[in-house]
Amino acid sequence: MKNIQTLFQTLNITPQNLTLYKQALTHSSYSNEQNPPQEDNERLEFLGDAIVGLLMADYLYSQSKEDEGIMTKKRAQAVCERSLTIYAHNIELQNYLLLGKGEKNKDFNAKSIIADTFEALFGAIYLDLGYLTAKKVFHNIVLPHLAKTIYIIDFKTQLQEIVQSEKKTIQYKIVQEQGPAHSKNFVAEVYLEKNLLGTGEGSTKKAAEQKAAQQALSKVAKPKDLLNNKGGKEKELQ
């Protein structure tokens, strides 16, 4: 196990309650081998899971105007076990873990253990230094790696980039809105001049527009075929 002070330097924090961090790094397999047993990181993991999810939601909400569905998918990808393991390895968190002999003999770098410890660490930071410090640490060690963990396809942006490359414009139109206020369904159409390129449905206007753009892109073998009227049909845009 590396000196925990090195971890604090990496995180750029000055802890007030060292016990919290030692607990965050203590796996239950190690705790159970001690006499008397030490407190493990499972409770901090429970708290940290909520903190990490909140920090990612906070970031996504503040940085974009995307609809709830897209942000939910992005958050799920950014804080899944695979993603948390990537962030943890970048600060070499696996080198600070206290594991029991049995776990060491199995797989010291088990993703689930490392991801859980990452969450426990943020639980400790939050309890010790507060939300704003946890947010600062999160931004420093997570945001640089989001490109590796978030892979939502933004079909509207793809379509817009294709059209803008030829100095043309597209328009979206909501043509149908059904259902009660708490369970709406929208139908959107996307046009290039008078050509209808695609139609899509969704629970929000933006989601329907995404589906319309996706359909437009799926109709052609090559993206630029859209500009040559190979993917659309003429329809008067009202």
UniProtKB/Swiss-Prot annotation:
Subcellular location: Cytoplasm
SUPFAM superfamilies the record matches: dsRNA-binding domain-like, RNase III domain-like
Composition bias type Basic and acidic residues, residue spans: 222-238
Gene Ontology molecular function terms on file: double-stranded RNA binding; metal ion binding; ribonuclease III activity; rRNA binding
E.C. number: 3.1.26.3
Predominant place of localization: cytoplasm
CDD domains with a match to the protein in the record: DSRM_RNAse_III_family (cd10845), RIBOc (cd00593)
Residues annotated as domain DRBM: 154-222
Annotated stretches, region: Disordered: 215-238
Residue ranges occupied by any RNase III domain in the UniProt entry: 4-130
Keyword Metal-binding part of the UniProt annotation: yes
Keywords from the UniProt entry: Cytoplasm, Endonuclease, Hydrolase, Magnesium, Metal-binding, mRNA processing, Nuclease, RNA-binding, rRNA processing, rRNA-binding, tRNA processing
Domain of life where this protein originates: Bacteria
GO BP term (any one): mRNA processing
InterPro entries in the record: dsRBD_dom (IPR014720), RNase_III (IPR011907), RNase_III_dom (IPR000999), RNase_III_sf (IPR036389)
Reactions accelerated catalytically: Endonucleolytic cleavage to 5'-phosphomonoester
Tagged with keyword Chaperone: no
Record family assignment: Belongs to the ribonuclease III family.
Database matches in NCBIfam families: RNaseIII
Protein purpose: Digests double-stranded RNA. Involved in the processing of primary rRNA transcript to yield the immediate precursors to the large and small rRNAs (23S and 16S). Processes some mRNAs, and tRNAs when they are encoded in the rRNA operon. Processes pre-crRNA and tracrRNA of type II CRISPR loci if present in the organism.
Quaternary context: Homodimer.
PANTHER family: RIBONUCLEASE 3, RIBONUCLEASE III
Record's protein name: Ribonuclease 3
UniProt source species: Onion yellows phytoplasma (strain OY-M)
